[in-house]
From Swiss-Prot:
Residues bound to heme b: H95
Positions where N-acetylalanine occurs in the chain: A1
Pfam families: Globin
One GO term describing the cellular component: extracellular region
Note: This molluscan globin lacks one of the heme-binding histidine residues found in most other globins.
Protein family (similarity comment): Belongs to the globin family.
MF terms (GO), sorted A to Z: heme binding; iron ion binding; oxidoreductase activity; oxygen binding; oxygen carrier activity
Gene3D superfamilies associated with the record: Globins
Name of protein: Globin
Subunit (UniProt): Monomer.
Stored PANTHER family: CYTOGLOBIN (PTHR46783), GLOBIN FAMILY PROFILE DOMAIN-CONTAINING PROTEIN (PTHR46783:SF3)
UniProt key word Iron: yes
Length: 144
Protein backbone atom coordinates (compact mmCIF):
# COMPACT_ATOMS: atom_id res chain seq x y z
CA UNK A 1 0.00 0.00 0.00
CA UNK A 2 1.00 3.60 -0.38
CA UNK A 3 1.40 6.13 2.39
CA UNK A 4 -1.61 8.28 3.22
CA UNK A 5 0.24 11.27 1.77
CA UNK A 6 0.93 9.50 -1.55
CA UNK A 7 -2.64 8.20 -1.67
CA UNK A 8 -3.88 11.77 -1.22
CA UNK A 9 -1.63 13.03 -4.01
CA UNK A 10 -2.87 10.26 -6.29
CA UNK A 11 -6.49 11.11 -5.54
CA UNK A 12 -5.91 14.80 -6.33
CA UNK A 13 -4.07 13.96 -9.54
CA UNK A 14 -6.59 11.34 -10.65
CA UNK A 15 -9.83 13.22 -9.92
CA UNK A 16 -9.76 15.54 -12.97
CA UNK A 17 -8.59 12.69 -15.21
CA UNK A 18 -11.37 10.34 -14.08
CA UNK A 19 -13.99 13.12 -14.20
CA UNK A 20 -13.92 12.81 -18.00
CA UNK A 21 -13.02 9.14 -18.09
CA UNK A 22 -14.57 8.32 -21.47
CA UNK A 23 -12.51 10.81 -23.44
CA UNK A 24 -9.43 10.60 -21.22
CA UNK A 25 -9.44 6.81 -21.19
CA UNK A 26 -9.51 6.70 -24.96
CA UNK A 27 -6.75 9.33 -25.10
CA UNK A 28 -4.66 7.27 -22.68
CA UNK A 29 -4.85 4.15 -24.85
CA UNK A 30 -4.03 6.15 -27.99
CA UNK A 31 -1.03 7.69 -26.19
CA UNK A 32 0.10 4.25 -24.97
CA UNK A 33 -0.25 2.70 -28.43
CA UNK A 34 1.53 5.67 -30.02
CA UNK A 35 4.54 5.35 -27.70
CA UNK A 36 4.47 1.55 -27.49
CA UNK A 37 2.72 0.23 -30.64
CA UNK A 38 3.26 -3.40 -29.65
CA UNK A 39 1.03 -2.82 -26.60
CA UNK A 40 -2.06 -2.89 -28.82
CA UNK A 41 -1.40 -6.57 -29.55
CA UNK A 42 -2.16 -7.48 -25.93
CA UNK A 43 -5.80 -6.49 -26.53
CA UNK A 44 -7.85 -8.92 -28.64
CA UNK A 45 -9.96 -6.05 -29.98
CA UNK A 46 -6.89 -4.20 -31.28
CA UNK A 47 -4.44 -6.95 -32.22
CA UNK A 48 -2.84 -6.28 -35.60
CA UNK A 49 -4.82 -3.06 -36.18
CA UNK A 50 -3.42 0.32 -37.15
CA UNK A 51 -3.61 3.23 -34.74
CA UNK A 52 -6.16 4.87 -37.07
CA UNK A 53 -8.33 1.74 -36.99
CA UNK A 54 -8.08 1.58 -33.20
CA UNK A 55 -9.06 5.24 -32.88
CA UNK A 56 -12.11 4.61 -35.08
CA UNK A 57 -13.08 1.43 -33.24
CA UNK A 58 -16.22 1.46 -31.10
CA UNK A 59 -14.33 -0.90 -28.78
CA UNK A 60 -11.84 1.83 -27.79
CA UNK A 61 -14.16 3.37 -25.20
CA UNK A 62 -15.26 -0.04 -23.89
CA UNK A 63 -11.70 -1.15 -23.26
CA UNK A 64 -10.52 2.19 -21.89
CA UNK A 65 -13.49 2.46 -19.53
CA UNK A 66 -12.63 -0.94 -18.02
CA UNK A 67 -9.00 0.13 -17.59
CA UNK A 68 -9.94 3.44 -15.98
CA UNK A 69 -12.49 1.77 -13.68
CA UNK A 70 -9.81 -0.63 -12.44
CA UNK A 71 -7.28 2.17 -12.04
CA UNK A 72 -9.91 4.12 -10.09
CA UNK A 73 -10.23 1.16 -7.70
CA UNK A 74 -6.47 1.19 -7.14
CA UNK A 75 -6.41 4.95 -6.54
CA UNK A 76 -9.42 4.78 -4.21
CA UNK A 77 -7.84 2.04 -2.09
CA UNK A 78 -4.16 3.01 -2.40
CA UNK A 79 -3.61 3.45 1.35
CA UNK A 80 -5.49 0.28 2.37
CA UNK A 81 -2.89 -2.49 2.54
CA UNK A 82 -5.44 -5.29 2.89
CA UNK A 83 -7.56 -4.27 -0.07
CA UNK A 84 -4.55 -3.43 -2.21
CA UNK A 85 -2.95 -6.80 -1.53
CA UNK A 86 -5.95 -8.79 -2.68
CA UNK A 87 -6.69 -6.44 -5.60
CA UNK A 88 -3.10 -6.62 -6.82
CA UNK A 89 -3.01 -10.41 -6.55
CA UNK A 90 -6.25 -10.74 -8.56
CA UNK A 91 -5.05 -8.18 -11.12
CA UNK A 92 -1.71 -9.95 -11.57
CA UNK A 93 -3.34 -13.35 -11.98
CA UNK A 94 -5.79 -12.02 -14.58
CA UNK A 95 -3.12 -10.19 -16.54
CA UNK A 96 -0.66 -13.08 -16.42
CA UNK A 97 -3.45 -15.14 -18.00
CA UNK A 98 -3.59 -12.60 -20.85
CA UNK A 99 0.18 -12.79 -21.31
CA UNK A 100 0.60 -9.27 -19.94
CA UNK A 101 3.56 -8.85 -17.65
CA UNK A 102 5.68 -6.40 -15.77
CA UNK A 103 7.40 -5.13 -18.93
CA UNK A 104 4.11 -3.81 -20.28
CA UNK A 105 3.42 -1.98 -17.03
CA UNK A 106 6.96 -0.58 -17.01
CA UNK A 107 5.90 1.07 -20.28
CA UNK A 108 2.72 2.42 -18.70
CA UNK A 109 4.66 3.67 -15.68
CA UNK A 110 7.08 5.50 -17.96
CA UNK A 111 4.36 7.44 -19.79
CA UNK A 112 1.49 7.83 -17.32
CA UNK A 113 2.74 10.87 -15.35
CA UNK A 114 3.26 12.74 -18.62
CA UNK A 115 -0.21 11.74 -19.76
CA UNK A 116 -1.70 13.08 -16.52
CA UNK A 117 0.29 16.30 -16.92
CA UNK A 118 -0.99 16.68 -20.50
CA UNK A 119 -4.50 16.95 -19.05
CA UNK A 120 -3.40 19.72 -16.65
CA UNK A 121 -4.08 17.46 -13.68
CA UNK A 122 -2.00 17.99 -10.53
CA UNK A 123 1.37 16.28 -10.73
CA UNK A 124 1.99 13.29 -8.50
CA UNK A 125 4.80 11.61 -10.41
CA UNK A 126 6.39 9.87 -7.42
CA UNK A 127 3.02 8.58 -6.20
CA UNK A 128 2.10 7.26 -9.67
CA UNK A 129 5.54 5.66 -9.86
CA UNK A 130 4.88 3.96 -6.52
CA UNK A 131 1.43 2.72 -7.53
CA UNK A 132 2.68 1.26 -10.80
CA UNK A 133 5.63 -0.18 -8.86
CA UNK A 134 3.16 -2.16 -6.74
CA UNK A 135 1.43 -3.42 -9.89
CA UNK A 136 4.76 -4.39 -11.46
CA UNK A 137 5.85 -6.21 -8.29
CA UNK A 138 2.57 -8.14 -8.21
CA UNK A 139 3.04 -9.18 -11.84
CA UNK A 140 6.62 -10.26 -11.14
CA UNK A 141 5.37 -12.33 -8.19
CA UNK A 142 2.88 -13.97 -10.56
CA UNK A 143 5.78 -14.96 -12.80
CA UNK A 144 5.29 -12.21 -15.37
Amino acid sequence: ALSAADAGLLAQSWAPVFANSDANGASFLVALFTQFPESANFFNDFKGKSLADIQASPKLRDVSSRIFARLNEFVSNAADAGKMGSMLQQFATEHAGFGVGSAQFQNVRSMFPGFVASLSAPAADAAWNSLFGLIISALQSAGK
